[in-house]
Amino acid sequence: MMKLMLFSIIVILFSLIGSIHGADVPGNYPLDSSDDTYLCAPLGENPFCIKICRKHGVKYGLMLRLPCWCEYFGKIKNVKI
């Protein structure tokens, strides 16, 4: 019985790890007209990055590391802001 319970816990943990890693959303860092990324703060979701991503035709973005990162943004296209 103890082995079955331990096995069940291990299976559940591996499923959780798989679901966390499987949630990667594709995206990219948008560039301005000078081929630079947009730096913003604070880390995480912020209005400036969302505004930049919307200018690039994407609904949502956030600060990931230092530059803004846009979800589902594949091709890098320069936009004059």
Curated annotation (Swiss-Prot):
Pull one GO CC term from this UniProt entry.
extracellular region
Signal peptide residues on this chain, from the entry's feature table: 1-22
- Give me the disulphide-bonded residues: C49-C68, C53-C70
For whether the record's keyword set contains Translocase, the answer is no
Identify the residues that the record assigns to the LCN-type CS-alpha/beta domain, covering every copy: 25-81
Could you tell me which Gene3D superfamilies the record lists for this protein? Knottin, scorpion toxin-like (3.30.30.10)
Keywords assigned = Disulfide bond, Ion channel impairing toxin, Neurotoxin, Secreted, Signal, Toxin
Give the UniProt subcellular location, in the record's own words: Secreted
Give a single Pfam family match: Toxin_3
* Main localization, broad class: secreted
Q: What does this protein do?
A: Probable neurotoxin that inhibits ion channels.
- Which family is it part of? Belongs to the long (3 C-C) scorpion toxin superfamily.
Full protein name: Toxin-like peptide AaF1CA5
Source species: Androctonus australis
